[in-house]
């Protein structure tokens, strides 16, 4: 009945349609006959939310090469090791071929000084070339909208979830036993429906954006937009320069997991202090109760 009212569907005439909506949005494995006609690659709730629309498809192909010490050294600088890379489907590429939006084909080949790393998704790929001044980030396939990295690796329940500015930050946090995701960029609009779903799974959702001007501005904007979901912001004690602005830089500078937990404890203490102050304002001193209210009109 509730779904019928919400979608404006007649309960009797559209009963089967209502069932299909419930099955699709809850990721239920029923109505096998209908699913056989319309095969779905991934049947989880979070994936369906992230695949409502896609950008134009760009054809691509690539050749994977094994990680060696040189290729792993870049990630090890941030405390990210091969087990974390594999869990998030990060690969090293020997070559990558695609075409521009205008249809012009091109090929990139990795070298010791310009490695090519790939974040491999379902039907799409994001290329990362950290040492390249041009074409540093590339996309191939059908990119989901919104793009969200790390969603598949999240547990069903957790204490804290961090919203970061990039994939490397997600990997840095995961390598230290923290849960994190990122969208396409810090300036991307975070869908409220996703935050609403995550709020049911995590006790605290914390924005952990860069400490530069853009990151601080966007963090404040998102905190305002998502105030109804009690999203908080944690500002890192960094200078905000190119080499000292995000959580990956924070760990690369020598800070440990325990140092980061200290920042979190300070943030949570401030949150709970504010809550206790609000609660105390509602307390009644029974030894000195307030005066009884007086009626303005006596009958």
Stretches found by the model and what they are:
Residues 217-228:
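Short, aromatic/basic amphipathic alpha-helical patches
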Residues 15-115, 151-159, 265-285:
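TOPRIM metal-binding catalytic domain and adjacent DNA-binding surface shared by DnaG-type primases
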Residues 279-299:
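P-loop NTPase catalytic core of nucleic-acid-dependent motor ATPases
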Residues 163, 202-214, 235:
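Acidic beta-strand-to-loop metal/phosphate-binding motif
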Residues 184-189, 210-211, 237-239:
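Short, acidic/turn-prone active-site loops that include or flank metal/cofactor-
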Residues 1-21:
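Short Cys/His-based metal-binding microdomains
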Residues 3, 75, 165, 173, ...:
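Terminal peptide-recognition signature
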Residues 95-201, 219:
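Phosphate-handling DNA/RNA-contact segment within nucleic-acid enzymes
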